[in-house]
Amino acid sequence: MSRLQFQLQTRDGRARRGRLTFPRGTVETPAFMPVGTYGSVKGILPDDVRALGAEIILGNTFHLYLRPGLDIIADHGGLHGFCRWDGPILTDSGGFQVFSLAHRRKITEQGVTFASPTDGARVFLGPEESMKIQKVLDSDVVMIFDECTPYPATEDVARRSMELSLRWAQRSRNAHDELGNDAALFGIVQGGVHTDLRSRSAEALQAIGFDGYAVGGLAVGEPEHERNAMLDHLDPELPSDRPRYLMGVGRPEDLVEGVARGVDMFDCVMPTRNARNGHYFTSFGTVRIRNSQYARDMDPIEPGCGCVACTGGYTRSYLRHLDRCNEMLAPMLGTLHNLFYYEKLMADIRAAIEAGTFLAFRESFYAARGAVAPPL
């Protein structure tokens, strides 16, 4: 029996307002999950992550398995004790990271053999191995092991990939149950940009039975309109009483469009990675702090923002100086700002759904950027 309870509280159009309840805490949805690839959200403390409004974070099974290894994490009682985060954690299965090693991997029915990016050693990962690793990590949400369908892919390639992922999904389900793991287990819908394959994947996953359903294989190069079309197609085909997770999709616009199409959960490295590259998100667009126009700019990143970078009086001029000097404080302040922006965006979205004003919120979101909302 899964430790996860999901309550769908209200809707506004297709946008959903809900709550995930775990023994380690509750998560208000729609939710954005900061990514802690190696067991930390880069550059900031777990208490900072919590203070920014995050209630759940993501850990990376693939990288944690390779380094530091399961024995060391087990010494700490699992990933929560290792990284000092006491709230819920979702761990991915490693499938996407294996996908990214395109020239150093071999896929068979059993799983994937690849050269470790850390030391070149031969490593095998399959559904059973992924479930065992995630059991040791003791995450609150476990993802099945799947193959991320590349883009572009012919329908035949996408079909064979999707069918392999379905067989791995059943093996993941079996292994998860045999391990006696009471963490939530999420299935992952694949099928590329082919609606019939997405439908087959969603139907087959529901026949197996999972605690939540993720949409994978997007944000891999496809145009935005194709991604939105897949979400439009899947919205009525996924069970309404289970959480829905759009994997790895993370521009602010993508979050708004995902929510508009029934998505409950998101993750992406974008707010943290972009902060390290001097790109700061605001309600009016992106501040690229390395541009010369900010050399003597006395404003904070976003006037009126409640993050510590903006309320602390740090000017764009100062942040540009820190960035140009490669000072550690620049990405730290940028990360604090970007994650604050993302978590506040999600809080504002939740409030708009509760008030029945999400569509108006969506229009104003784009208007502030000088843009027009894409069609729904």
Swiss-Prot record:
Catalyzes the base-exchange of a guanine (G) residue with the queuine precursor 7-aminomethyl-7-deazaguanine (PreQ1) at position 34 (anticodon wobble position) in tRNAs with GU(N) anticodons (tRNA-Asp, -Asn, -His and -Tyr). Catalysis occurs through a double-displacement mechanism. The nucleophile active site attacks the C1' of nucleotide 34 to detach the guanine base from the RNA, forming a covalent enzyme-RNA intermediate. The proton acceptor active site deprotonates the incoming PreQ1, allowing a nucleophilic attack on the C1' of the ribose to form the product. Belongs to the queuine tRNA-ribosyltransferase family. Pathway: tRNA modification; tRNA-queuosine biosynthesis. Homodimer. Within each dimer, one monomer is responsible for RNA recognition and catalysis, while the other monomer binds to the replacement base PreQ1. The keyword Zinc applies. SUPFAM superfamilies: tRNA-guanine transglycosylase. Residues 248-254, 272-276 are annotated as: RNA binding. One of its GO terms (molecular function) is tRNA-guanosine(34) queuine transglycosylase activity. Keywords: Glycosyltransferase, Metal-binding, Queuosine biosynthesis, Transferase, tRNA processing, Zinc. It comes from Stenotrophomonas maltophilia (strain K279a). Binds 1 zinc ion per subunit. The active site is at residues 92, 267. The keyword Transferase applies. Pfam families: TGT (PF01702). Substrate binds at residues 92-96, 146, 190, 217. Its EC number is 2.4.2.29. Its cofactor is Zn(2+). GO terms for cellular component: cytosol. This is Queuine tRNA-ribosyltransferase. HAMAP family: Q_tRNA_Tgt.
